[in-house]
Amino acid sequence: MTEPTTPLMQQYHAVKKQHPAALLLFRLGDFYELFYDDAVVASKILQITLTARNKEKGQAVPMCGVPYHAAENYIARLIRAGHKVAICEQMEVPGPGKKIVRREVIRVITPGTAGGAGLVDAKENNFLAAVARSAGAGVAAGASASGAGRGGARGIEAAIGLAFVDLSTGEFRATEFSGDKAEARLRDELGILRPREVLLARPATLFPVNVPAEMDGLGAVETRLDDWVFETNYAARILEEHFRVAALEGFGLVGHAQATAAAGALVHYLRETSAIGARSPEDSAVIPSLRPAGAGLEHLNRIAYYEQQEAMILDAVTVRNLELVEPSTGDDASATLLRAIDDTATGMGARLLRGWILRPEIALGEIEARLDAVAELRAQTVAREEIHRTLEVILDLERLTSRVTLGVATPRDLLALRGSLERIPALRQLLAGAMLSALSDPSASGVTARGNSRLSSLHEELDEMADVRDTIARGIADDPPAVAGDPGLIRRGYDAELDELHDITKKGRQIIAAMEERERKRTGIASLKIRYNQVFGFYIEIS
Protein backbone atom coordinates (compact mmCIF):
# COMPACT_ATOMS: atom_id res chain seq x y z
CA MET A 1 0.00 0.00 0.00
CA THR A 2 1.56 3.31 -1.07
CA GLU A 3 1.79 6.30 1.24
CA PRO A 4 -1.22 8.64 0.98
CA THR A 5 -0.38 11.84 -0.87
CA THR A 6 -3.63 13.80 -0.69
CA PRO A 7 -5.59 15.01 2.36
CA LEU A 8 -8.50 12.78 1.34
CA MET A 9 -6.39 9.62 1.20
CA GLN A 10 -4.66 10.58 4.44
CA GLN A 11 -8.10 10.76 6.01
CA TYR A 12 -9.00 7.39 4.50
CA HIS A 13 -5.88 5.71 5.89
CA ALA A 14 -6.49 7.14 9.36
CA VAL A 15 -9.99 5.67 9.40
CA LYS A 16 -8.90 2.34 7.91
CA LYS A 17 -6.28 1.87 10.64
CA GLN A 18 -9.10 1.90 13.18
CA HIS A 19 -10.97 -0.90 11.37
CA PRO A 20 -8.37 -3.08 9.64
CA ALA A 21 -10.52 -6.23 9.65
CA ALA A 22 -13.54 -4.64 7.94
CA LEU A 23 -14.27 -3.60 4.39
CA LEU A 24 -14.41 0.19 4.66
CA LEU A 25 -17.22 1.94 2.75
CA PHE A 26 -15.93 5.51 2.52
CA ARG A 27 -18.59 8.12 1.68
CA LEU A 28 -17.66 10.43 -1.19
CA GLY A 29 -20.65 12.48 -2.34
CA ASP A 30 -23.35 10.16 -3.64
CA PHE A 31 -21.18 7.04 -3.47
CA TYR A 32 -19.50 4.77 -0.97
CA GLU A 33 -16.00 4.07 -2.27
CA LEU A 34 -13.66 1.21 -1.40
CA PHE A 35 -9.90 1.40 -1.94
CA TYR A 36 -6.88 -0.88 -2.16
CA ASP A 37 -7.44 -4.53 -1.13
CA ASP A 38 -10.97 -3.74 0.05
CA ALA A 39 -11.84 -2.67 -3.48
CA VAL A 40 -10.36 -5.82 -5.00
CA VAL A 41 -12.32 -8.07 -2.63
CA ALA A 42 -15.60 -6.14 -2.94
CA SER A 43 -15.47 -5.86 -6.74
CA LYS A 44 -15.29 -9.65 -7.04
CA ILE A 45 -18.17 -10.27 -4.64
CA LEU A 46 -20.39 -7.50 -6.00
CA GLN A 47 -19.43 -8.02 -9.64
CA ILE A 48 -18.73 -4.33 -10.15
CA THR A 49 -15.97 -2.62 -12.11
CA LEU A 50 -12.59 -2.20 -10.42
CA THR A 51 -11.02 1.11 -11.42
CA ALA A 52 -8.03 3.09 -10.16
CA ARG A 53 -7.38 6.50 -8.61
CA ASN A 54 -4.32 8.70 -9.24
CA LYS A 55 -3.22 6.69 -12.29
CA GLU A 56 -1.87 9.82 -13.92
CA LYS A 57 0.55 10.30 -11.00
CA GLY A 58 1.94 6.80 -11.29
CA GLN A 59 0.38 5.80 -7.94
CA ALA A 60 -2.66 3.85 -9.07
CA VAL A 61 -4.98 3.06 -6.16
CA PRO A 62 -7.54 0.29 -6.83
CA MET A 63 -11.06 1.51 -6.14
CA CYS A 64 -14.71 0.69 -6.71
CA GLY A 65 -17.93 2.26 -5.53
CA VAL A 66 -21.66 1.77 -4.95
CA PRO A 67 -24.46 4.40 -4.84
CA TYR A 68 -25.25 5.40 -1.27
CA HIS A 69 -29.02 5.14 -1.81
CA ALA A 70 -28.68 1.47 -2.80
CA ALA A 71 -25.95 0.61 -0.29
CA GLU A 72 -28.00 -1.81 1.80
CA ASN A 73 -28.31 -4.32 -1.03
CA TYR A 74 -24.57 -4.27 -1.63
CA ILE A 75 -23.80 -4.48 2.08
CA ALA A 76 -26.06 -7.52 2.34
CA ARG A 77 -24.03 -9.32 -0.31
CA LEU A 78 -20.77 -8.53 1.46
CA ILE A 79 -22.17 -9.72 4.78
CA ARG A 80 -23.50 -12.95 3.27
CA ALA A 81 -20.00 -13.56 1.92
CA GLY A 82 -18.75 -13.52 5.52
CA HIS A 83 -17.17 -10.05 5.63
CA LYS A 84 -17.47 -7.24 8.14
CA VAL A 85 -18.37 -3.81 6.80
CA ALA A 86 -17.47 -0.44 8.34
CA ILE A 87 -19.58 2.49 7.13
CA CYS A 88 -17.70 5.80 7.10
CA GLU A 89 -20.03 8.77 6.70
CA GLN A 90 -19.59 12.46 6.01
CA MET A 91 -20.23 14.13 9.35
CA GLU A 92 -20.55 17.63 7.88
CA VAL A 93 -22.52 19.03 4.99
CA PRO A 94 -20.05 19.86 2.19
CA GLY A 95 -19.98 23.58 1.62
CA PRO A 96 -18.00 26.47 0.15
CA GLY A 97 -14.51 26.90 1.54
CA LYS A 98 -14.30 23.38 2.99
CA LYS A 99 -11.36 21.52 1.52
CA ILE A 100 -12.25 18.23 3.19
CA VAL A 101 -15.26 17.29 5.31
CA ARG A 102 -15.03 15.40 8.57
CA ARG A 103 -15.72 11.68 8.23
CA GLU A 104 -16.23 8.99 10.87
CA VAL A 105 -17.27 5.36 11.01
CA ILE A 106 -20.85 5.40 12.25
CA ARG A 107 -21.44 1.65 12.31
CA VAL A 108 -19.70 -1.66 11.85
CA ILE A 109 -21.94 -4.39 10.45
CA THR A 110 -20.81 -7.99 10.91
CA PRO A 111 -22.45 -11.29 9.96
CA GLY A 112 -23.72 -11.63 13.53
CA THR A 113 -24.92 -8.05 14.01
CA ALA A 114 -26.75 -7.55 10.73
CA GLY A 115 -30.34 -6.49 11.23
CA GLY A 116 -31.54 -4.81 8.04
CA ALA A 117 -34.38 -6.20 5.96
CA GLY A 118 -32.03 -7.21 3.17
CA LEU A 119 -29.32 -8.53 5.47
CA VAL A 120 -31.08 -11.44 7.15
CA ASP A 121 -33.30 -14.36 6.17
CA ALA A 122 -36.92 -13.60 7.09
CA LYS A 123 -37.60 -17.17 8.26
CA GLU A 124 -34.42 -17.74 10.25
CA ASN A 125 -32.74 -16.14 13.22
CA ASN A 126 -29.47 -14.32 12.73
CA PHE A 127 -27.55 -15.30 15.83
CA LEU A 128 -24.37 -13.82 17.21
CA ALA A 129 -22.89 -16.24 19.76
CA ALA A 130 -20.10 -16.10 22.32
CA VAL A 131 -18.26 -19.02 23.93
CA ALA A 132 -16.44 -18.67 27.26
CA ARG A 133 -14.35 -21.41 28.86
CA SER A 134 -13.16 -21.66 32.44
CA ALA A 135 -9.66 -22.84 33.33
CA GLY A 136 -9.38 -26.51 32.44
CA ALA A 137 -12.05 -26.45 29.72
CA GLY A 138 -10.34 -27.08 26.41
CA VAL A 139 -6.91 -26.19 27.82
CA ALA A 140 -5.26 -28.95 25.83
CA ALA A 141 -5.94 -27.01 22.67
CA GLY A 142 -4.70 -23.72 24.07
CA ALA A 143 -8.14 -22.29 24.76
CA SER A 144 -8.10 -19.11 26.77
CA ALA A 145 -10.02 -19.26 30.04
CA SER A 146 -12.25 -16.53 31.40
CA GLY A 147 -12.55 -15.57 35.03
CA ALA A 148 -9.17 -15.39 36.72
CA GLY A 149 -8.83 -17.81 39.61
CA ARG A 150 -11.93 -19.80 38.67
CA GLY A 151 -12.39 -23.30 37.25
CA GLY A 152 -10.45 -26.52 37.52
CA ALA A 153 -7.37 -24.95 39.08
CA ARG A 154 -9.16 -24.84 42.44
CA GLY A 155 -11.07 -28.07 42.12
CA ILE A 156 -14.14 -26.47 40.57
CA GLU A 157 -15.53 -28.39 37.62
CA ALA A 158 -14.49 -26.83 34.32
CA ALA A 159 -17.37 -25.20 32.47
CA ILE A 160 -18.21 -23.78 29.06
CA GLY A 161 -20.57 -20.84 28.73
CA LEU A 162 -22.62 -20.12 25.62
CA ALA A 163 -24.67 -16.99 25.01
CA PHE A 164 -26.39 -15.90 21.84
CA VAL A 165 -28.39 -12.92 20.65
CA ASP A 166 -30.41 -12.03 17.58
CA LEU A 167 -30.03 -8.28 17.26
CA SER A 168 -32.81 -8.20 14.67
CA THR A 169 -35.44 -9.64 17.06
CA GLY A 170 -34.12 -8.99 20.57
CA GLU A 171 -33.83 -12.65 21.57
CA PHE A 172 -31.01 -13.02 24.13
CA ARG A 173 -30.26 -16.31 25.92
CA ALA A 174 -27.43 -18.07 27.73
CA THR A 175 -26.57 -21.53 29.03
CA GLU A 176 -23.64 -23.42 30.49
CA PHE A 177 -22.16 -26.90 30.08
CA SER A 178 -19.92 -28.86 32.42
CA GLY A 179 -18.58 -32.37 32.81
CA ASP A 180 -16.83 -34.65 30.38
CA LYS A 181 -19.52 -34.14 27.72
CA ALA A 182 -19.40 -30.35 27.80
CA GLU A 183 -17.65 -30.02 24.44
CA ALA A 184 -20.09 -32.41 22.76
CA ARG A 185 -23.06 -30.52 24.22
CA LEU A 186 -21.60 -27.23 22.98
CA ARG A 187 -21.26 -28.68 19.48
CA ASP A 188 -24.85 -29.93 19.57
CA GLU A 189 -26.18 -26.54 20.66
CA LEU A 190 -24.19 -24.65 18.05
CA GLY A 191 -25.42 -27.13 15.45
CA ILE A 192 -29.00 -26.19 16.40
CA LEU A 193 -28.38 -22.45 16.56
CA ARG A 194 -26.22 -22.15 13.43
CA PRO A 195 -24.87 -18.72 14.47
CA ARG A 196 -23.49 -16.46 11.77
CA GLU A 197 -20.66 -15.28 14.01
CA VAL A 198 -19.01 -16.61 17.19
CA LEU A 199 -16.99 -14.53 19.66
CA LEU A 200 -14.00 -16.17 21.33
CA ALA A 201 -11.30 -15.07 23.75
CA ARG A 202 -8.03 -14.60 21.94
CA PRO A 203 -6.32 -17.00 21.03
CA ALA A 204 -8.96 -19.68 21.64
CA THR A 205 -10.35 -21.98 18.97
CA LEU A 206 -14.05 -22.74 18.70
CA PHE A 207 -13.57 -26.49 19.04
CA PRO A 208 -10.42 -27.37 21.00
CA VAL A 209 -10.67 -30.99 19.84
CA ASN A 210 -11.07 -32.49 16.38
CA VAL A 211 -14.23 -31.21 14.74
CA PRO A 212 -16.72 -33.96 13.83
CA ALA A 213 -17.69 -34.20 10.17
CA GLU A 214 -21.24 -33.08 10.90
CA MET A 215 -19.93 -29.73 12.20
CA ASP A 216 -17.93 -28.93 9.07
CA GLY A 217 -20.83 -26.92 7.67
CA LEU A 218 -21.31 -24.63 10.69
CA GLY A 219 -19.93 -21.78 8.62
CA ALA A 220 -19.73 -19.21 11.42
CA VAL A 221 -17.28 -16.34 11.25
CA GLU A 222 -14.97 -16.54 14.27
CA THR A 223 -14.14 -13.20 15.90
CA ARG A 224 -11.51 -13.08 18.63
CA LEU A 225 -11.56 -10.48 21.38
CA ASP A 226 -9.08 -9.68 24.13
CA ASP A 227 -9.39 -12.23 26.91
CA TRP A 228 -10.23 -9.57 29.52
CA VAL A 229 -13.57 -9.05 27.74
CA PHE A 230 -14.55 -12.55 28.95
CA GLU A 231 -13.49 -11.91 32.56
CA THR A 232 -16.49 -12.75 34.75
CA ASN A 233 -16.42 -9.65 36.97
CA TYR A 234 -16.25 -7.35 33.96
CA ALA A 235 -19.06 -9.29 32.27
CA ALA A 236 -21.31 -9.05 35.32
CA ARG A 237 -20.64 -5.32 35.57
CA ILE A 238 -21.42 -4.61 31.92
CA LEU A 239 -24.60 -6.72 32.07
CA GLU A 240 -25.81 -4.93 35.22
CA GLU A 241 -25.12 -1.61 33.54
CA HIS A 242 -26.91 -2.64 30.35
CA PHE A 243 -30.00 -4.02 32.10
CA ARG A 244 -29.90 -1.24 34.74
CA VAL A 245 -30.04 -3.64 37.66
CA ALA A 246 -27.98 -3.98 40.84
CA ALA A 247 -27.57 -7.76 40.50
CA LEU A 248 -28.24 -10.53 37.99
CA GLU A 249 -30.31 -12.88 40.20
CA GLY A 250 -33.48 -12.08 38.31
CA PHE A 251 -31.98 -13.40 35.07
CA GLY A 252 -30.86 -16.76 36.48
CA LEU A 253 -27.18 -16.07 35.82
CA VAL A 254 -25.94 -16.24 39.41
CA GLY A 255 -23.78 -19.34 39.83
CA HIS A 256 -23.14 -19.57 36.10
CA ALA A 257 -19.87 -17.69 35.70
CA GLN A 258 -19.11 -18.79 32.14
CA ALA A 259 -22.63 -18.10 30.87
CA THR A 260 -22.27 -14.64 32.42
CA ALA A 261 -18.86 -14.19 30.78
CA ALA A 262 -20.23 -15.13 27.35
CA ALA A 263 -23.27 -12.85 27.72
CA GLY A 264 -21.10 -9.95 28.84
CA ALA A 265 -18.81 -10.43 25.85
CA LEU A 266 -21.84 -10.15 23.55
CA VAL A 267 -22.96 -6.85 25.08
CA HIS A 268 -19.38 -5.54 24.93
CA TYR A 269 -19.09 -6.45 21.25
CA LEU A 270 -22.48 -4.97 20.36
CA ARG A 271 -21.47 -1.72 22.00
CA GLU A 272 -18.16 -1.73 20.16
CA THR A 273 -19.74 -2.31 16.75
CA SER A 274 -22.92 -0.29 17.19
CA ALA A 275 -22.04 2.58 19.53
CA ILE A 276 -19.95 4.38 16.94
CA GLY A 277 -20.56 7.52 15.01
CA ALA A 278 -22.42 10.78 15.42
CA ARG A 279 -21.35 12.71 18.48
CA SER A 280 -24.22 15.18 18.53
CA PRO A 281 -27.80 15.63 17.30
CA GLU A 282 -26.43 17.99 14.65
CA ASP A 283 -24.17 15.22 13.34
CA SER A 284 -27.07 12.76 13.25
CA ALA A 285 -29.12 15.15 11.16
CA VAL A 286 -26.41 15.17 8.51
CA ILE A 287 -26.49 11.42 7.96
CA PRO A 288 -30.12 10.31 8.27
CA SER A 289 -29.81 7.35 5.90
CA LEU A 290 -27.51 5.37 8.17
CA ARG A 291 -27.88 6.70 11.67
CA PRO A 292 -25.67 5.13 14.35
CA ALA A 293 -27.13 2.29 16.37
CA GLY A 294 -25.12 2.83 19.53
CA ALA A 295 -28.04 4.14 21.57
CA GLY A 296 -30.31 1.47 20.18
CA LEU A 297 -29.76 -1.68 22.23
CA GLU A 298 -32.75 -0.99 24.49
CA HIS A 299 -34.74 -3.80 22.89
CA LEU A 300 -32.25 -6.22 24.45
CA ASN A 301 -34.03 -5.67 27.75
CA ARG A 302 -33.76 -9.17 29.20
CA ILE A 303 -31.69 -12.32 29.01
CA ALA A 304 -33.04 -15.80 29.68
CA TYR A 305 -30.87 -18.52 31.19
CA TYR A 306 -31.89 -22.02 30.12
CA GLU A 307 -30.72 -25.58 30.54
CA GLN A 308 -30.21 -27.65 27.43
CA GLN A 309 -32.19 -30.53 28.90
CA GLU A 310 -35.34 -28.40 29.22
CA ALA A 311 -36.13 -29.55 25.68
CA MET A 312 -35.38 -32.75 23.81
CA ILE A 313 -31.67 -32.73 22.96
CA LEU A 314 -31.02 -33.37 19.28
CA ASP A 315 -27.43 -33.80 18.20
CA ALA A 316 -26.17 -32.61 14.83
CA VAL A 317 -26.21 -36.13 13.35
CA THR A 318 -29.88 -36.61 14.26
CA VAL A 319 -30.91 -33.22 12.90
CA ARG A 320 -29.12 -33.95 9.64
CA ASN A 321 -30.29 -37.55 9.18
CA LEU A 322 -33.92 -36.73 9.97
CA GLU A 323 -33.78 -33.78 7.54
CA LEU A 324 -35.63 -31.61 10.01
CA VAL A 325 -34.73 -28.21 8.55
CA GLU A 326 -32.10 -28.93 5.89
CA PRO A 327 -31.79 -31.78 3.37
CA SER A 328 -29.07 -34.31 4.16
CA THR A 329 -27.89 -34.16 0.55
CA GLY A 330 -28.36 -31.58 -2.17
CA ASP A 331 -30.27 -28.33 -1.88
CA ASP A 332 -33.87 -29.52 -2.17
CA ALA A 333 -35.42 -27.89 0.90
CA SER A 334 -38.81 -29.43 0.03
CA ALA A 335 -37.49 -32.72 1.41
CA THR A 336 -37.36 -31.36 4.96
CA LEU A 337 -39.91 -31.66 7.75
CA LEU A 338 -39.95 -27.88 8.14
CA ARG A 339 -40.94 -27.30 4.54
CA ALA A 340 -43.60 -30.02 4.71
CA ILE A 341 -45.46 -28.47 7.65
CA ASP A 342 -44.61 -24.77 7.38
CA ASP A 343 -47.81 -22.91 6.57
CA THR A 344 -46.92 -19.92 8.71
CA ALA A 345 -48.06 -16.51 7.54
CA THR A 346 -45.35 -14.34 9.12
CA GLY A 347 -41.59 -14.40 9.52
CA MET A 348 -42.12 -14.41 13.28
CA GLY A 349 -44.18 -17.59 13.06
CA ALA A 350 -41.69 -19.24 10.71
CA ARG A 351 -38.83 -18.63 13.14
CA LEU A 352 -40.90 -19.90 16.05
CA LEU A 353 -41.82 -23.09 14.19
CA ARG A 354 -38.20 -23.71 13.25
CA GLY A 355 -37.21 -23.32 16.89
CA TRP A 356 -39.92 -25.74 18.03
CA ILE A 357 -38.76 -28.36 15.54
CA LEU A 358 -35.12 -28.09 16.59
CA ARG A 359 -35.99 -28.02 20.31
CA PRO A 360 -38.97 -30.37 20.74
CA GLU A 361 -40.99 -29.66 23.88
CA ILE A 362 -40.86 -32.33 26.62
CA ALA A 363 -43.12 -30.72 29.26
CA LEU A 364 -46.43 -32.59 29.10
CA GLY A 365 -48.54 -29.61 30.15
CA GLU A 366 -47.13 -27.38 27.41
CA ILE A 367 -47.54 -30.10 24.77
CA GLU A 368 -51.19 -30.64 25.72
CA ALA A 369 -51.92 -26.90 25.80
CA ARG A 370 -50.57 -26.51 22.26
CA LEU A 371 -52.51 -29.51 20.96
CA ASP A 372 -55.75 -28.34 22.57
CA ALA A 373 -55.40 -24.86 21.06
CA VAL A 374 -54.75 -26.43 17.66
CA ALA A 375 -57.84 -28.62 18.08
CA GLU A 376 -59.99 -25.57 18.78
CA LEU A 377 -58.84 -23.75 15.67
CA ARG A 378 -58.99 -26.89 13.54
CA ALA A 379 -62.67 -27.27 14.42
CA GLN A 380 -63.41 -23.66 13.37
CA THR A 381 -62.52 -23.50 9.70
CA VAL A 382 -63.91 -20.03 9.03
CA ALA A 383 -62.28 -18.44 12.07
CA ARG A 384 -58.98 -20.18 11.36
CA GLU A 385 -58.89 -18.96 7.76
CA GLU A 386 -59.77 -15.41 8.79
CA ILE A 387 -56.98 -15.44 11.37
CA HIS A 388 -54.56 -16.71 8.72
CA ARG A 389 -55.59 -13.99 6.25
CA THR A 390 -55.13 -11.34 8.92
CA LEU A 391 -51.68 -12.64 9.82
CA GLU A 392 -50.65 -12.62 6.16
CA VAL A 393 -50.83 -8.81 6.03
CA ILE A 394 -48.94 -8.33 9.31
CA LEU A 395 -45.27 -7.72 8.58
CA ASP A 396 -42.35 -8.79 10.75
CA LEU A 397 -43.08 -6.74 13.87
CA GLU A 398 -40.08 -8.16 15.73
CA ARG A 399 -37.63 -6.93 13.15
CA LEU A 400 -39.45 -3.68 12.39
CA THR A 401 -39.41 -2.64 16.04
CA SER A 402 -35.77 -3.71 16.36
CA ARG A 403 -34.85 -1.51 13.39
CA VAL A 404 -36.61 1.42 15.05
CA THR A 405 -34.74 0.80 18.32
CA LEU A 406 -31.43 0.39 16.52
CA GLY A 407 -31.94 3.74 14.81
CA VAL A 408 -31.76 2.32 11.28
CA ALA A 409 -35.46 2.30 10.38
CA THR A 410 -36.50 4.16 7.25
CA PRO A 411 -39.65 6.30 7.00
CA ARG A 412 -41.30 3.46 5.09
CA ASP A 413 -40.42 1.07 7.90
CA LEU A 414 -42.46 3.31 10.20
CA LEU A 415 -45.44 3.17 7.84
CA ALA A 416 -45.07 -0.61 7.65
CA LEU A 417 -45.05 -0.75 11.45
CA ARG A 418 -48.18 1.37 11.63
CA GLY A 419 -49.95 -0.73 8.99
CA SER A 420 -49.17 -3.97 10.81
CA LEU A 421 -50.19 -2.60 14.21
CA GLU A 422 -53.52 -1.52 12.72
CA ARG A 423 -54.30 -5.21 12.14
CA ILE A 424 -53.86 -6.17 15.80
CA PRO A 425 -57.37 -5.10 16.96
CA ALA A 426 -58.92 -7.27 14.24
CA LEU A 427 -56.71 -10.19 15.24
CA ARG A 428 -57.72 -9.85 18.89
CA GLN A 429 -61.37 -9.76 17.87
CA LEU A 430 -60.97 -12.94 15.82
CA LEU A 431 -59.30 -14.70 18.74
CA ALA A 432 -62.10 -13.59 21.06
CA GLY A 433 -64.67 -14.93 18.61
CA ALA A 434 -62.87 -18.26 18.36
CA MET A 435 -62.81 -18.54 22.14
CA LEU A 436 -66.55 -17.86 22.43
CA SER A 437 -67.40 -20.35 19.68
CA ALA A 438 -65.31 -23.03 21.34
CA LEU A 439 -66.93 -22.42 24.71
CA SER A 440 -70.44 -22.49 23.24
CA ASP A 441 -69.88 -25.96 21.74
CA PRO A 442 -66.98 -27.66 23.53
CA SER A 443 -67.93 -31.12 22.26
CA ALA A 444 -67.55 -30.04 18.63
CA SER A 445 -64.25 -28.28 19.12
CA GLY A 446 -62.69 -30.59 21.66
CA VAL A 447 -62.05 -27.52 23.82
CA THR A 448 -60.49 -28.00 27.23
CA ALA A 449 -59.53 -25.55 29.92
CA ARG A 450 -55.95 -25.76 28.73
CA GLY A 451 -56.76 -24.95 25.12
CA ASN A 452 -59.05 -22.08 25.92
CA SER A 453 -56.45 -20.75 28.33
CA ARG A 454 -53.86 -20.64 25.54
CA LEU A 455 -56.13 -18.71 23.14
CA SER A 456 -57.23 -16.50 26.02
CA SER A 457 -53.65 -15.64 26.94
CA LEU A 458 -52.85 -14.82 23.31
CA HIS A 459 -55.87 -12.53 23.23
CA GLU A 460 -54.97 -10.79 26.48
CA GLU A 461 -51.25 -10.40 25.78
CA LEU A 462 -51.68 -8.74 22.37
CA ASP A 463 -51.08 -5.03 22.91
CA GLU A 464 -52.92 -2.94 20.31
CA MET A 465 -50.40 -0.08 20.85
CA ALA A 466 -52.92 2.59 19.91
CA ASP A 467 -50.58 5.37 21.09
CA VAL A 468 -47.82 4.24 18.74
CA ARG A 469 -50.22 3.94 15.80
CA ASP A 470 -51.60 7.40 16.51
CA THR A 471 -48.15 8.99 16.78
CA ILE A 472 -47.03 7.55 13.44
CA ALA A 473 -50.33 8.46 11.77
CA ARG A 474 -50.15 12.07 12.98
CA GLY A 475 -46.45 12.55 12.39
CA ILE A 476 -45.42 10.68 9.23
CA ALA A 477 -46.64 11.68 5.76
CA ASP A 478 -48.65 9.14 3.76
CA ASP A 479 -46.00 9.02 1.04
CA PRO A 480 -42.72 9.75 2.81
CA PRO A 481 -39.30 9.85 1.13
CA ALA A 482 -37.08 6.78 1.21
CA VAL A 483 -34.47 8.64 3.29
CA ALA A 484 -35.29 10.38 6.56
CA GLY A 485 -33.37 13.55 5.73
CA ASP A 486 -35.23 14.26 2.51
CA PRO A 487 -38.14 16.74 2.49
CA GLY A 488 -41.66 15.49 3.03
CA LEU A 489 -41.13 13.10 5.95
CA ILE A 490 -43.23 14.86 8.62
CA ARG A 491 -46.92 15.38 7.94
CA ARG A 492 -47.98 19.00 7.51
CA GLY A 493 -49.82 20.24 10.59
CA TYR A 494 -47.83 18.11 13.04
CA ASP A 495 -45.52 20.98 14.04
CA ALA A 496 -46.23 24.64 13.24
CA GLU A 497 -42.59 25.73 13.39
CA LEU A 498 -41.54 22.94 11.03
CA ASP A 499 -44.32 23.92 8.62
CA GLU A 500 -43.02 27.49 8.65
CA LEU A 501 -39.48 26.33 7.90
CA HIS A 502 -40.74 24.19 5.03
CA ASP A 503 -42.60 27.19 3.65
CA ILE A 504 -39.42 29.23 3.82
CA THR A 505 -37.44 26.64 1.86
CA LYS A 506 -40.17 26.28 -0.75
CA LYS A 507 -40.98 29.97 -1.08
CA GLY A 508 -37.55 31.41 -0.41
CA ARG A 509 -37.43 33.73 -3.43
CA GLN A 510 -40.85 35.17 -2.74
CA ILE A 511 -39.94 35.72 0.92
CA ILE A 512 -36.67 37.48 0.01
CA ALA A 513 -38.45 39.66 -2.56
CA ALA A 514 -41.11 40.63 0.00
CA MET A 515 -38.42 41.40 2.58
CA GLU A 516 -36.56 43.54 0.02
CA GLU A 517 -39.72 45.53 -0.70
CA ARG A 518 -40.42 46.04 3.02
CA GLU A 519 -36.89 47.32 3.64
CA ARG A 520 -37.12 49.75 0.69
CA LYS A 521 -40.33 51.19 2.10
CA ARG A 522 -39.00 51.29 5.66
CA THR A 523 -35.71 53.01 4.73
CA GLY A 524 -36.91 55.01 1.76
CA ILE A 525 -33.94 53.76 -0.28
CA ALA A 526 -35.25 52.73 -3.69
CA SER A 527 -31.93 51.16 -4.75
CA LEU A 528 -31.80 48.74 -1.78
CA LYS A 529 -31.37 45.13 -2.85
CA ILE A 530 -30.90 41.82 -1.04
CA ARG A 531 -28.16 39.76 -2.64
CA TYR A 532 -26.42 36.42 -1.94
CA ASN A 533 -23.00 34.95 -2.60
CA GLN A 534 -21.09 31.94 -1.31
CA VAL A 535 -18.63 34.05 0.69
CA PHE A 536 -20.96 36.33 2.68
CA GLY A 537 -24.31 34.61 2.32
CA PHE A 538 -27.26 37.04 2.20
CA TYR A 539 -26.46 40.75 2.41
CA ILE A 540 -28.05 44.13 1.68
CA GLU A 541 -26.65 46.12 -1.24
CA ILE A 542 -27.20 49.86 -1.61
CA SER A 543 -26.04 51.58 -4.76
Name what the model sees in each region.
Residues 380-381:
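Short intracellular "coupling" helices and adjacent cytoplasmic loop segments at the cytosolic face
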Residues 1-376, 385, 392-405, 409-441, ...:
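Charged catalytic and DNA/RNA-contacting regions of genome-maintenance
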Residues 202, 532, 542-543:
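Active-site proximal loops enriched in glycine and acidic residues that flank catalytic Cys/His/Asp
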Residues 510-530:
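Flexible, glycine/threonine-enriched loop-and-boundary segments that flank and lead into catalytic domains
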Residues 348, 522, 542:
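Residue-level signal for short amphipathic helical patches enriched in basic/charged
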Residues 526, 538-543:
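Structured beta-rich ligand-binding regulatory domains in large eukaryotic signaling proteins
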